[in-house]
Amino acid sequence: MFDARRPKALITGTPGVGKTTHCRKLAAFLNTKCISVGELLAGTPYVTYIPELDTYEIVDLDGAVKRVHSVVEPGHIIDTHVVELVPDPEVVIVLRKAPDVLFAELKRRGWPLKKILDNVWAEILDVVLIKARERWGEVAQIDVTRRRPEETFELLKKCVAGGRCHSDVVDWLGYSEESGFLEFIERLSRSESF
């Protein structure tokens, strides 16, 4: 059933895959708003900042949900990796990135090692994809690793235009094992825990 309050799309995925960039670009193309949930909640009483990890943690889930729902309007594009916070969108797109490439990107950004490891493991283990599927069933999955941003944008446009959503098959655990990255990230994780 159609709900007039539904946002147009949710662009989700592990931090560092390009959600915010694509949300803003898609919103500009559609002449609507990109609601970046992280930016919306930063500095509110619903989250607390953890300086050593350079991240926010949700401390009031109900309050955060109400805040997000109070801002989202029909047609908006939402960007977040915390799928529990958003109203049901018309379409859900999970952006994916190879864990070794994601590791390099987050390191380039100067993120703390623990935060990098948490996010790389989340990508290897499909955490955001699984949460999205648990909530909405089948969702589109786009591997951005070897795609130019313009190619990803074209796939997103087709998906939100009501056309058939492109969906890649991703197996980052197998990929990481075959490439040797899994051994590297396990070793790094063990050394970080001491």
Swiss-Prot record:
Residues 36-59 are annotated as: NMP. InterPro entries: Adenyl_kinase_AK6, P-loop_NTPase. One of its GO terms (biological process) is rRNA processing. Keywords: ATP-binding, Kinase, Nucleotide-binding, Ribosome biogenesis, rRNA processing, Transferase. It holds the Pfam family AAA_18. The keyword Ribonucleoprotein does not apply. It catalyses: AMP + ATP = 2 ADP; ATP + H2O = ADP + phosphate + H(+). GO terms for molecular function: adenylate kinase activity; ATP binding; ATP hydrolysis activity. It comes from the Archaea. The keyword Transport does not apply. Its EC number is 2.7.4.3. ATP binds at residues 16, 18-21, 109. SUPFAM superfamilies: P-loop containing nucleoside triphosphate hydrolases. Interacts with uS11. Not a structural component of 40S pre-ribosomes, but transiently interacts with them by binding to uS11. Broad-specificity nucleoside monophosphate (NMP) kinase that catalyzes the reversible transfer of the terminal phosphate group between nucleoside triphosphates and monophosphates. Also has ATPase activity. Involved in the late maturation steps of the 30S ribosomal particles, specifically 16S rRNA maturation. While NMP activity is not required for ribosome maturation, ATPase activity is. Associates transiently with small ribosomal subunit protein uS11. ATP hydrolysis breaks the interaction with uS11. This is Putative adenylate kinase.
